[in-house]
From Swiss-Prot:
GO terms for molecular function: ADP binding; ATP binding; phosphotransferase activity, phosphate group as acceptor; protein serine/threonine kinase activity. It holds the Pfam family Kinase-PPPase. The lineage of its organism: Bacteria, Pseudomonadati, Thermodesulfobacteriota, Desulfuromonadia, Geobacterales. This is Putative pyruvate, phosphate dikinase regulatory protein. NCBIfam families: PRK05339.1.
Amino acid sequence: MKKIYVLSDSTGETAERVVRAALSQFGGSDVRIVRLAKVCNQQEVQQAVATVTADEGLLVYTLVDSSLAVAVHTIAEEHGLMAFDLLSPLLHSLSVFLGTVAQSTPGLLHQIDTDYFRRMEAVNFTVKHDDGQENRGLVKADLVLVGVSRSSKTPLSMYLANKGYKVANVPLVKGIDPPEELEAIDPSKVVGLLISPKRLVEIRTSRLVNMGQSMKNSYADYEKVEDEIAFCRQYYRRHPGWLIIDVTCKSVEESASEILRRLVGQFAE
């Protein structure tokens, strides 16, 4: 079995993913990837190159310290080892393009990568728990948004998810009991959304028009909407520990900022 060694002054996770992506173009090749992480000095570089040479492997490396990258290149050539520098050419091009030098701080790429996957995990969670789906998973949410239909629950949930928060949202419908799971949630995680009846009628009317449905639909009837909002307020009063915000005149960004600001004890932007 052939071996590809991934050498890095950080975790090597990002470089390994790049290698695996490239390997996917070669079908079912019998290749093992071995990670050599946290290589931070020339002695460790020499030991790593010796190991790869003994196995007749391919060396792929990402080292932000240019002196270490040069050392790997030099020692690999001395051993007749096939080695590929993933990072240095890009750092050089970016340095020329931006007119500045790289920080040469190991681990920054891994941190960016980690943040990205954390956001993706949050987005996936939020999609699965949109509009009352998967109520059994509410307890795993960072935030739970509650409100009547068209009160910005979904766009607000997705905006917060893209900041890395796992968000579930639950619709309030007069005449239908909210899910029991909602009562078991830590009150400090729940946000109740309010909106003026007039604005809600405008939003719902626009939706009916876009969907080609009859304007006589009670969904956008002013009196029915007023009843829904009254029910909503009454329900919120039974949960004094919830954060209640009015989204009537706010953009999604403004509502999200208010939520994070007022829950600063739990979340930091």
